């Protein structure tokens, strides 16, 4: 309901939200109660004689059947009736197939005979389970089930005593017996399931020991379940109220309503019934048959068959995909769609209709580019615009426009389609005969056509990240495609080859406001995914910019003029031309400088920038113009290209966004495109065949290179044939060969490519596109010109397909380049047929890959999002999920948002100790250096003051500590970190803004720097709180930034490098603080979804299988998408598990020792070192069959240490491979030992010497002595020795580990190539140095054993098997490992994702203390609500579980709320807005009855004529551009950050600001006719929202009666205070008194002219004479809405220069001038009495009291009683607070400026009980009203909340002071002698006290008739917030004040600091504004 307006006819009240959803199983009774078909449905037919049949399947009581009919139950028609359930009484109960498994579990937990729980509920284990599984009933059942599984006897009462293994005293036992477990002690059957039937079988029961097996009928189960008690139900995880076990058996079957199973009417034929109806018919048929058979007493087997069939039908109705059961089919053979199939899957009910729906107000068509649109616009075809509508409410301001649209109707554009009257009637203008007759009234809605400037959401699928849906402004254009700016295609990932996009038109102003403030394209320029812009300059603009900014581009005057025409922000000044003679010429760079916004500073390089130049001698000159410098918004040097204008971090666009804001950046994009594209039109850019031709020398080169490459390949082939090729370690011969060939060919391609590149001229158009980065790469050029190169399939050369050859055209076994896919032609030359075929093979693979990848990554993304969708930043800044579990204590561990951080280098990390000291230590000994950098007085101070020197030493010490810390955090010395606030750039900005001359000494005191930085870092708070934990957390969160801050803003660098002045330094600190605060992550931000998208989107870009074929000896690991899948699935068996083993000490540097360790790790079996084996029959060892062994065998047999007699004649001879033995450092002895250890005495093993030429093992079986005996006696079936030996042989070769770790099959050893694996050490000089050390990488993992090996570095050694790390090292380690692995996967192909997203995923997976996979097995096993789980996967299973256990869903997550159509607690939905009812009193009615509100009416009338400063007010001074305007500060908790996105916008109470619009309301939605340019404050008439729109508020409408609920009821006490003289208890007040006519149009109990107490008294208008005829309040001529009284009518504009208080038109009693009258427009800032900008020239308070404003300190100093020296006002007196003269700070409700404060009204006597600080005027409970909040200051910008001196209860302030007593007769307001003109009332008499009733505090300072205060006096400047005569700097004669003379045309009351050019703005204000 929220979002749009109410549907027609419905109430406008919001519906109550659903707070939780309770699941359960329906009991049979409830089903019958709910059913509308009494007696159940008995007939399988639907109709009888053409009528629906009662009791049939289309029972008319169940819902509407015909379109025209009505429902018999609720009499609703088809749209109204929701349908009603019926029921079928089943003849016999059947199992519910959804609960079958649950049924079995419960059966196994309770006794088969007496239904008691098999485990006593007093068992401590059960108690433990109950305690542990609170709120997780499913867990409880699982645990109880595990306990009961082992029990096969139901424990009886007698075994009680010894049950817990504890002897219990007799008494206890009796007790337990009584409340008894008292089982029956019988044996329990095993429950088995087959199909849909359950069997119970007993094993050996005592009585008769044969087995017994019976079929368990559902009745029997029902009986067992029925007897389970409620307590035991609870133990079983059921919830007896919602789900008893016996309800899981179906006895009464509910029949779904007709609307769920509608019949399809085919033309001509009968109705086609829904699948469900068919199924129900089957059930009813078989049910009736079963009932008949039972009654007729049919045979048991017949009934059993029937039951079986019934069971089948009921089961297939629920689930038709049951394993092991036939499908229920229709006659055609199509399986029926069961209830389960309706819910599950993507197209099912949950995902297809609840989570995602089709929507109205959307459009889709093809997109085309249009560079002339702004990036946030979208061109919409007129045909679409005329069809899509937006409902606009009619107000007095838009009535004429809407009336005109209605007149045009639907036929012409722009027009309107419908009118919705305020009673909900729709008038369709398409069919209305004469739309022009229709008259609109305020409150109607008009559905008008979409028009220019509407806000829409534009989207392109797939929506991979939040930049795929952005807000655009509509621009109606002809023809039929959407047009969009080229730069926006990047985030949408769109191109114009036929892509279509979707457009959605939001239907409510709230939605609109949100899109405008949160989702507009310019706000999305920088992505939080990788903190860089996502939009850059592309295509022709980019090509052109590179050409345009070259050194030799000059433009003539005419050209310059033409280009400037396209520069929307041009200020009219043409810069000085670069060349004057012979004729003026401008350079391209100069024109580009005009486009660059603001004072941006930036240094980048051009794409062709040579790296060596930066250190070379010409680094400042940049010969190729390749160094880009933008300084102060001017392009000084350099050619711009993709690096500076593309989507890279730190590009010009990025800096513009961060420094200038999104709006200016938007213009930057538009201006570049319009200007540059139009230059390109003149310049031209083309490409042709000519660009692809190189010179003949190059072609010669290319031929030679290819020839040589072929020759090389042939050589390698020959080597391989001749077996001369040495395999590289870790590779087979074939792999080595392939690698070498590949390398040769790739080198050839690269070499030819680079020679082709070199041959191209500077003006080549291919080259210009590549260089600018617009299209293509170097490889593309070289493929066009030189060689296409090697084609690969699956990372290898084209494989053999046809009998050892690739194509039939080649000979067999041809390994040459041509036949294996090397294409030696270029695209220009054209490919030969075979080349073409190979090229196509390579290309095809890419296509398949892409297709497969899309599906894979789409699913990954969905899982990621589902697992993190509800993770958000809460208002305590923690990151939590929907069940309020903390996932992170601060988002990203630093609490900052991803879009606002940048890459920065930490200055102190890298430099050596010497360099560090030189750069950072403030050297106060070197006087000469000091004089160069600091001013003289500072030098003296520094040199002489020891305290200062200590401070500076301490500063350096601190930095040294920081450096130590950093070197622990970044041990590799890699210091690129993401931090907010780019300090170096901010300093540069400061130097430019304050015009710092880096050659002059600075006036910035070093101590000021040190202290400033200290103070600043105290202000940067991420974690509030003073407890040690919070302090530690705060330190951790801001550690890096603080280190960065201290090292950049250290005194030495400030003095030497930056030379900032004191002023500039202050600005810098302020800027850092505000930027830092803006970077903090917003509460309500859905960071979970953000992280999921940030990871899913790069995954989509990843290629599926990443091959790297140059793998020399690096082992290959899974990468890309497959690896990502492994990680988030937490697969137990990764494809390539691997350890990276780092070594310690010597072994790391010494290859031999490293090899030792390698051998210790690598698993070696005998087979790996065996050359060959043989079995011989060799009965006589002394003369062996193998002659060569004779010699050494004899040695053994001469002196045998074994029983020669037992030796078997069979011999196993193993010959070992010497090379492998030495490789693995094995000796024969070790092997023999292993064999002996394994087989012991059963084998005899002898071996020869390690140095023998053949290494031989001889193995024989030893026969035991007993064996010998047995053989003769009995022939046992024994294996023959030779067979046995053969078995031993295979066992030995494969299973016997010689050394190493079984899991580790192979170990590679190599020296690291990349720095990240080298060992980084810090030398004693403090420099980083990378050492090459040997690294082992393994196939297979065994972390535990490897870590315990000696010489292995246990700290750095890691595994890539996540599960293993978890088991070995625990959860924290696995979190880090997971983060590293994810980082590797993503960074492998060069992407970068901000750490915070990876961290959030890792934390989500590990925050429960175990690994949660991002699959249904992880996500759906969490404690989230069932609705969320069922929206992910396993829909029906989850819902069944939830029902069986009676779970409930607390509706806290995103999915749940979306399903139920509620606002999810996300973003703007995670807080509430409170309306401050008090503020509503100040709302103004919009007088709708003023004559002339017709066509041109409002213009002059509402707002005064345009010339008056108010009409022409400029948007620049509206309160929300004015951080310092306390008018807004007063009611908004975030003063000073008016520009902070989201602070003011979300300020909960901003809605009724001093101006009718709160900053949160976008000015766009109430066009103020008087001043089209002004967003609001100039309109005193916009009421507080909802005011004027409801008819009950219009004073002239009959409904406005004083007692109407919306009106102002005079009796309501809360209303009384607003009229000072209105005292409900005053005796003469009676509602019937003659001058109180409630129906008079002017009646307003709060209007001063209505004086209930005495006709002659109106305290606020002393000149009011009751006898003046025009003032009889009931007289018809006096109506506040009559034109002459319109408070804004031109003659009243108090600010109009001609206005003078004495002018005849000035009538102080006009209602608009009574400060206490609510109709006195307080909603415009110029009228708000509490706003400092309140213009005191308005005579809005009693002007006849000559010296009337006593509390204002600048009050006429000559008044005797208020002379500033009088003790009661002396600035030193304790109760005087100069900064808030009239505000009582300690009482939130006391504001003398509020008209309602009238101390004499009895209800306001401060001592009377009703006067409480909670007085409604300032409800302190409204969020922004914390009286102690410093920003709460209604009247004075300087207000101090703690000043005790103004508390009405403070002794000095007693209203009972003798002079003044509210009850004394002298002050009774009704006493006749009290008349403002009576002599006793002399304001100068001392008894006039500020609390006296006539004192109108709303004007702080001005008395119009007093000669001293004429408003034209030059010193009178009441609105400057600084103005306070007591402030020391202010001297009333100072000329500063003159700028603020209210009559000077620049003065406008709505802005305290308006005259922007005036020097009077003091730096304080400007600080606040930044």
Curated annotation (Swiss-Prot):
Biased composition (Low complexity): 1546-1568, 1608-1959
Record region (Disordered): 1546-1970
PTM sites of type Phosphotyrosine: 1860, 1867, 1874, 1881, 1909, 1916, 1923, 1930
Phenotypic consequence of residue 1936 to R: Loss of acetylation and loss of regulation of growth-factor-induced gene expression
Catalysed reaction equations from the record: RNA(n) + a ribonucleoside 5'-triphosphate = RNA(n+1) + diphosphate; a 3'-end ribonucleotidyl-ribonucleotide-RNA + H2O = a 3'-end ribonucleotide-RNA + a ribonucleoside 5'-phosphate + H(+)
Consequence when changing residue 457 to T: In NEDHIB; uncertain significance; severe; no effect on cell viability
Pfam families per UniProt: RNA_pol_Rpb1_1 (PF04997), RNA_pol_Rpb1_2 (PF00623), RNA_pol_Rpb1_3 (PF04983), RNA_pol_Rpb1_4 (PF05000), RNA_pol_Rpb1_5 (PF04998), RNA_pol_Rpb1_6 (PF04992), RNA_pol_Rpb1_7 (PF04990), RNA_pol_Rpb1_R (PF05001)
Modification type N6,N6,N6-trimethyllysine: residues: 1866, 1873
Effect of residue 1251 to S: In NEDHIB; uncertain significance; severe; no effect on cell viability
Biological function: Catalytic core component of RNA polymerase II (Pol II), a DNA-dependent RNA polymerase which synthesizes mRNA precursors and many functional non-coding RNAs using the four ribonucleoside triphosphates as substrates. Pol II-mediated transcription cycle proceeds through transcription initiation, transcription elongation and transcription termination stages.
Protein name from the UniProt record: DNA-directed RNA polymerase II subunit RPB1
């Amino acid at each position: 309901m929220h979002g749009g307006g109410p549907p027609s006819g419905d109430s406008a009240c919001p519906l109550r939200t659903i707070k939780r959803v309770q699941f359960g199983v329906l009991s049979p009774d409830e089903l019958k109660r709910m059913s509308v078909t009494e007696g159940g449905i008995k007939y399988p037919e639907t109709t009888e004689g053409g009528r629906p049949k009662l009791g049939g399947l289309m029972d008319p009581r169940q819902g509407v059947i015909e379109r025209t009919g009505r429902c018999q139950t609720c009499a609703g028609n088809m749209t109204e009736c929701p349908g009603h359930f019926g029921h079928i009484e089943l003849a016999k109960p059947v199992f519910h197939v959804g609960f079958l498994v649950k049924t079995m579990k419960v059966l196994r937990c309770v006794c088969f005979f007496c239904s008691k729980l098999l485990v006593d509920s007093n068992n401590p284990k059960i108690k433990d389970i109950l305690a542990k599984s609170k709120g997780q009933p499913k867990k409880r059942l699982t645990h109880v089930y595990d306990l009961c599984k082992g029990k096969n006897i139901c424990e009886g009462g007698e075994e009680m005593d010894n049950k817990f293994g504890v002897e219990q005293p007799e008494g206890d036992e009796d007790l337990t017996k009584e409340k008894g477990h008292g089982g029956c002690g019988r044996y329990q059957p095993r429950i088995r399931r087959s199909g849909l039937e359950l069997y119970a079988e007993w094993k050996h029961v005592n009585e008769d020991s044969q087995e017994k097996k019976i079929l368990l009928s559902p009745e029997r189960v029902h009986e067992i379940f029925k007897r389970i008690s409620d307590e035991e139900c609870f133990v079983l995880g059921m919830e007896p109220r919602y789900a008893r076990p016996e309800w899981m058996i179906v006895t009464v079957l509910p029949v779904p309503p007709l609307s769920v199973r509608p019949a399809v009417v085919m033309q001509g034929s009968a109705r086609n019934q829904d699948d469900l109806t068919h199924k129900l018919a089957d059930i009813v048929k078989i049910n009736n048959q079963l009932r008949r058979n039972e009654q007729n007493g049919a045979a048991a087997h017949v009934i059993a068959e029937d039951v079986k069939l019934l069971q089948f039908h009921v089961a297939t109705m629920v689930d038709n995909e049951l394993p092991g059961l036939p499908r229920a089919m229709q006659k055609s053979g199509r399986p029926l769609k069961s209830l389960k199939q309706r819910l599950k899957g993507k197209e099912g009910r949950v995902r297809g209709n609840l989570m995602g729906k089709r929507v109205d107000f959307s459009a889709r068509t093809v997109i085309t580019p249009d560079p002339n649109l702004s990036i946030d616009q979208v061109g919409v075809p007129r045909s679409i615009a005329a069809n899509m509508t937006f409902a606009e409410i009619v107000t007095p301001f838009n009535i004429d426009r809407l009336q005109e649209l209605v007149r045009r109707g639907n036929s012409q554009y722009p027009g309107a389609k419908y009118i919705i009257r305020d009673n909900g009637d729709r008038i369709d203008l398409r069919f209305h005969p004469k739309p022009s007759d229709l008259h609109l009234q305020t409150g109607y809605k008009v559905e008008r056509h979409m028009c220019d400037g509407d806000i829409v959401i534009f989207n392109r699928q797939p929506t991979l990240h939040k930049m795929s849906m952005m807000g655009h402004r509509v621009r109606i254009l002809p023809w039929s495609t959407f047009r969009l700016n080229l730069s926006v295609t990047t985030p949408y990932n769109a191109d114009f080859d036929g892509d279509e996009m979707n457009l959605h038109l939001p239907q409510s102003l709230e939605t609109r406001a949100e899109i405008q403030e949160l989702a507009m394209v310019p706000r999305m320029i920088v992505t939080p995914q990788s903190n860089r812009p996502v939009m850059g300059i592309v295509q022709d603009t980019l090509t052109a910019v590179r050409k345009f900014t070259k050194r030799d581009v000059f433009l003539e005057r005419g050209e310059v003029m033409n280009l400037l025409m396209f520069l929307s922000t041009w200020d009219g000044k043409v810069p000085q031309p670069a060349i004057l003679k012979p004729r003026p010429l401008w350079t391209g760079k100069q024109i580009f400088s005009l486009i660059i916004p603001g004072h941006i500073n930036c240094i980048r390089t051009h794409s062709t920038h040579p790296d060596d130049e930066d250190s070379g001698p010409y680094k400042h000159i940049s010969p190729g113009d390749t160094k880009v410098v933008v300084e102060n918004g001017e392009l000084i040097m350099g050619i711009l290209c993709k690096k500076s204008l593309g989507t890279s971090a730190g590009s010009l666009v990025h800096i513009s966004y961060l420094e200038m804001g999104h709006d200016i950046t938007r213009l930057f994009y538009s201006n570049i495109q319009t200007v540059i594209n139009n230059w390109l039109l003149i310049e031209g850019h083309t490409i042709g065949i000519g660009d692809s031709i190189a010179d003949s020398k190059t072609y010669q080169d290319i031929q030679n290179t290819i020839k040589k490459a072929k020759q090389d390949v042939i050589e390698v082939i020959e080597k391989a044939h001749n077996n001369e090729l040495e395999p590289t370690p870790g590779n087979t011969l074939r792999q080595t060969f392939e690698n070498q060939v590949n390398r040769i060919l790739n080198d050839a391609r690269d070499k030819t490519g680079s020679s082709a590149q070199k041959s191209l001229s500077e003006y080549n158009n291919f080259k210009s596109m590549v260089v600018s980065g617009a299209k293509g790469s170097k490889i593309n050029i070289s493929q066009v010109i030189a060689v296409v190169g090697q084609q690969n399939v699956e990372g290898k050369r084209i494989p053999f397909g046809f009998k050892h050859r690739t194509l039939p055209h080649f000979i067999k076994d041809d390994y040459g380049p041509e036949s294996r896919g090397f294409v030696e032609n270029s695209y220009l030359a054209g490919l030969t047929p075979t080349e073409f075929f190979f090229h196509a093979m390579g290309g095809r693979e890419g296509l398949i890959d892409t297709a497969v990848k899309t599906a894979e990554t789409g699913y990954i993304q969905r899982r990621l999002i589902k697992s993190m969708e509800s993770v958000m930043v809460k208002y305590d800044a923690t990151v939590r999920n929907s069940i309020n579990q903390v996932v992170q204590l601060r988002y990203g561990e630093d609490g900052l948002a991803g879009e606002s951080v940048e890459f920065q280098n930490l200055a102190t990390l890298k430099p050596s100790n010497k360099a560090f000291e030189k750069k950072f230590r403030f050297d106060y000994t070197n006087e000469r250096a000091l004089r160069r950098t600091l001013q003289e007085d500072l030098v003296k101070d520094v040199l002489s003051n020891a305290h200062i020197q200590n401070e500076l030493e301490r500063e350096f010490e601190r930095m040294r500590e920081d450096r130590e810390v950093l070197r622990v955090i970044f041990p590799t010395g890699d210091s690129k970190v993401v931090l907010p606030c780019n300090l170096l750039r901010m300093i540069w900005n400061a130097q430019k803004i304050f015009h710092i001359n880096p050659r002059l000494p600075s006036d910035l005191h070093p101590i000021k720097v040190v202290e400033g930085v200290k103070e600043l870092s105290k202000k940067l708070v991420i974690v509030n709180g003073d407890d040690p934990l919070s302090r530690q957390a705060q330190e951790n969160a801001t550690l890096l930034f603080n280190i960065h801050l201290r090292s950049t803003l250290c005194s030495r660098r400030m003095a030497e490098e930056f030379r900032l002045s004191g002023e500039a330094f202050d600005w810098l600190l302020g800027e850092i603080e505000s930027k830092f605060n803006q970077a903090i992550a917003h509460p309500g931000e859905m960071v979970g979804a953000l992280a999921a998208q940030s990871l899913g989107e790069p995954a989509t870009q990843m290629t599926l299988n990443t091959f790297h074929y140059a793998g020399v000896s690096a082992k290959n690991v899974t990468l890309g998408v497959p690896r990502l899948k492994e990680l988030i699935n937490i697969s137990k068996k990764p494809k390539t598990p691997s350890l990276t083993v780092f070594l310690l000490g010597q072994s790391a540097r010494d290859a031999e020792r490293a090899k030792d360790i390698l051998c210790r790790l690598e698993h070696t079996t005998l087979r790996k070192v065996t050359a060959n084996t043989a079995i011989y029959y060799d009965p006589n060892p002394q003369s062996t069959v193998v002659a060569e062994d004779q010699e050494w065998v004899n040695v053994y047999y001469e002196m045998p240490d074994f029983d020669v007699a037992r030796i078997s004649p069979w011999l196993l001879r193993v010959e070992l491979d010497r090379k492998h033995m030495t490789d693995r450092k094995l000796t024969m002895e070790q092997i023999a030992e292993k064999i002996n250890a394994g087989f012991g005495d059963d084998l005899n093993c002898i071996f020869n010497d390690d140095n023998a030429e053949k290494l031989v093992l001889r193995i024989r079986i030893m026969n035991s002595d007993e064996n010998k005996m047995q053989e003769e006696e009995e022939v046992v079936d024994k294996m023959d020795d030779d067979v046995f030996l053969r078995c031993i042989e295979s066992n030995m070769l494969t299973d016997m580990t010689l050394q190493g770790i079984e899991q580790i099959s192979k170990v590679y050893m190599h020296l690291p190539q990349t720095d990240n694996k080298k060992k980084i050490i810090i030398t004693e000089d403090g420099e980083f140095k990378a050492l090459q050390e040997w690294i082992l990488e393994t196939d297979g993992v065994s972390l535990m054993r490897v870590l315990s090996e000696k010489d292995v570095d246990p700290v750095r050694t890691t595994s890539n098997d996540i599960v293993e790390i978890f088991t070995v090292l625990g959860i924290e380690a696995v979190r880090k490992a997971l983060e590293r692995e994810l980082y590797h996967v993503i960074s492998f192909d060069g992407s970068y994702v901000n750490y915070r997203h990876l961290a959030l995923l890792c934390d989500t997976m590990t925050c429960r203390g175990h690994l949660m996979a991002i699959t249904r097995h992880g996500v759906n096993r969490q404690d989230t609500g069932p609705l969320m789980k069922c929206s992910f996967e396993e829909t029906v299973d989850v819902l069944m579980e939830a029902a069986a256990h009676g779970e409930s869903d607390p509706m806290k997550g995103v999915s749940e709320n979306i399903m139920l159509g509620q606002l999810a607690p996300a973003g703007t939905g995670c807080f509430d807005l409170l309306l401050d009812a008090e503020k509503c009193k100040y709302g103004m009615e919009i007088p709708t009855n003023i004559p002339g509100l017709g066509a041109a009416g409002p213009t002059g009338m509402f707002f005064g004529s345009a010339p008056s400063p108010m009409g022409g007010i400029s948007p620049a001074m509206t309160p929300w551009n004015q951080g310092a305007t306390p008018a807004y500060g007063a009611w908004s908790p975030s003063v000073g950050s008016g520009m902070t996105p989201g602070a003011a916008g979300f300020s909960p109470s901003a809605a009724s600001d001093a101006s009718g619009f709160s900053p949160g309301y976008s000015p766009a939605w109430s066009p103020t006719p008087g001043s089209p340019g002004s967003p609001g404050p100039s309109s005193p008439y916009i009421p507080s929202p909802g005011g004027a729109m409801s008819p009950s508020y219009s004073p002239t409408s009959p409904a406005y009666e004083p007692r109407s609920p919306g009106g102002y009821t005079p009796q309501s006490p809360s209303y009384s205070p607003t009229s000072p003289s209105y005292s409900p208890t005053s005796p003469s007040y009676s509602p019937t008194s003659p001058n109180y006519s409630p129906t008079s149009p002017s009646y307003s109990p709060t209007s001063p002219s209505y004086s209930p107490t005495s006709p002659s008294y109106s305290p606020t208008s002393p000149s009011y004479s009751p006898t003046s005829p025009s003032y009889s309040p009931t007289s018809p001529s006096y109506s506040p809405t009559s034109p002459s009284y319109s408070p804004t009518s031109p003659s009243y504009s108090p600010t109009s220069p001609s206005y003078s208080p004495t002018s005849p038109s000035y009538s102080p009693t006009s209602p608009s001038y009574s400060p206490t009258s609510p109709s006195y427009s307080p909603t415009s800032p110029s009228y708000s009495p509490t706003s400092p900008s309140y213009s005191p020239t308005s005579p809005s308070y009693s002007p006849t009291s000559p010296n009337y404003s006593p509390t204002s300190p600048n009050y006429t100093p000559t008044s005797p009683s208020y002379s500033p020296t009088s003790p009661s006002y002396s600035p030193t007196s304790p109760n005087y607070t100069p900064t808030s003269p009239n505000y009582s700070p300690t009482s939130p409700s006391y504001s003398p400026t509020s008209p309602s404060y009238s101390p004499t009204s009895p209800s306001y006597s401060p001592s009377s009980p009703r006067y409480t600080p909670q007085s409604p005027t300032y409800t302190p409970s409204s969020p922004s009203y914390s009286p102690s909040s410093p920003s709460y200051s209604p009247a004075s910008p300087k207000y101090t909340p703690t000043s005790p001196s103004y508390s009405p209860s403070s002794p000095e302030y007693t209203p009972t002071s003798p002079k003044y007593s509210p009850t004394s007769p002298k002050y009774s307001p009704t006493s006749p002698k009290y008349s403002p003109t009576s002599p006793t009332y002399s304001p100068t008499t001392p008894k006039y006290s500020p609390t006296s009733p006539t004192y109108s505090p709303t004007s702080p300072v001005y008395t119009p008739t007093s000669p001293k205060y004429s408003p034209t006096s030059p010193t009178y400047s009441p609105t400057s917030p600084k103005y306070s005569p007591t402030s020391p700097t202010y001297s009333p004669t100072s000329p500063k004040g003159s700028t603020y003379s209210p009559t000077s045309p620049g003065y406008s009351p709505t802005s305290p600091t308006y005259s922007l050019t005036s020097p009077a703005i003091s730096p304080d204000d400007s600080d606040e504004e930044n």
